[in-house]
Amino acid sequence: MDKRTTQFLKSRFQSYYKNAEIGLPDHLPNREWAFIFYDDMPEKMMHRHKSFGSPGEALDYLYGMAPAHVYNSTAYYEYPDAKKMNEKNWLGAELIFDLDADHLPNAPRNYADMLELVKKEALKLLDFLLDDFGFSEQEIQLVFSGGRGYHFHIVSPKVLTLGSSERREIVNYVSGRDLEFKYFFREVAMDGDFGTGSKTFKGMKNVPMKCTLVGYDSGWGRRIALYLTDYMKRESEKKYKKDMFPELRRHEKVGDTTIKKLINIANSETGLKDILEKGRLDFDVRNFKEIAAYFMQESAEDFLHRFGASVDEPVTADIKRLIRVPGSLHGGSGMLVKKLALSELEEFDPLNDAVVFGERPVKITASKPFSVQLKGKDLRIEEGIQEVPEYAAVYLICRGVAEYGHRRNQPDTV
């Protein structure tokens, strides 16, 4: 990045910070801040161990310095500006989740598709935070990172003193790592109107057994119920019976009789509903506990891909992590690190809603062809000199595929 390009970006960032609404963290004097400046480019040197005593001091600093990247600590310190970490005196830390397309298997290369995929992961994580862990919406802060993902901040007092190992356990839970499916299926003595009959068999030596799904109405049990019912419905709708339930047919105790019963349950008015609302899995099928556990184990990869949340474990486990400040700009994209209400996530479009610069034409020199979708437009950039809207110029320069202005002896692109 040449000097003129650096000055252009710094001036654009400074114009933004003049009136920016920055999401300053609570307990501001107890937070460490860190910055990467355009004046250090192309080196990405982090300047850290800084603290601010008041909101005005922090905002004045951002406007005056116009940094490329802005971070604050997720931890609270007694002495946040101490130069050595062991001298800061750690007091606690928010619980942080980082979802980034870089950590998703088979993430698409197209930026818009990539962002859509990571949003789905964010929605799955949000379900865990609200349903499984019971955090209130007020305890969850959601932020678009300005790049390829989302950050979740849990600010509940219940999590502040959790250590790294406890935080890793939380990651293991939301990802479904080491999930033991056999413990979700249980055989119990049939009693009353729950299983295949309505009689009570208490006191009998040989009591009929029924298979039930443990925890069918919440947590992983609910997700297993959804997966099973979706599978049964999908398979029963196939045209030919011989093509139905191929995964179950591989089990030695599953024959045509069992398949027929499963089809009947899937096609009945109450069969699938009873799984979701009662955890009922007896179906008058012998060995169904064993069969169901086998199916879930065989389908584990697909099940966890659908329901597990892929989060960056090192970020969550790090109790002294630096994270981007909401309301700041991401120096790798020029986009806004945007705080969102939880209700906004599903409809949020980063390539429109996190773009802060305007339409003013800016001349750039692109080093290679490049395409991107911004503000509802498909922008196709050719190598060479051309004019683009300011928001596109900032994005392309931040991505490292263009310089500001034009070079001598460089032909304009028509």
Curated annotation (Swiss-Prot):
Enzyme Commission code: 2.7.7.-
Pfam families, A to Z: DNA_primase_S (PF01896)
GO cellular component terms, A-Z: DNA-directed RNA polymerase complex; primosome complex
Keywords per UniProt: DNA replication, DNA-directed RNA polymerase, Magnesium, Manganese, Metal-binding, Nucleotidyltransferase, Primosome, Transcription, Transferase
Main EC class the enzyme belongs to: transferase
Known role: Catalytic subunit of DNA primase, an RNA polymerase that catalyzes the synthesis of short RNA molecules used as primers for DNA polymerase during DNA replication. The small subunit contains the primase catalytic core and has DNA synthesis activity on its own. Binding to the large subunit stabilizes and modulates the activity, increasing the rate of DNA synthesis while decreasing the length of the DNA fragments, and conferring RNA synthesis capability. The DNA polymerase activity may enable DNA primase to also catalyze primer extension after primer synthesis. May also play a role in DNA repair.
Name used for this protein in its record: DNA primase small subunit PriS
Source organism per UniProt: Methanosarcina acetivorans (strain ATCC 35395 / DSM 2834 / JCM 12185 / C2A)
Primary gene name: priS
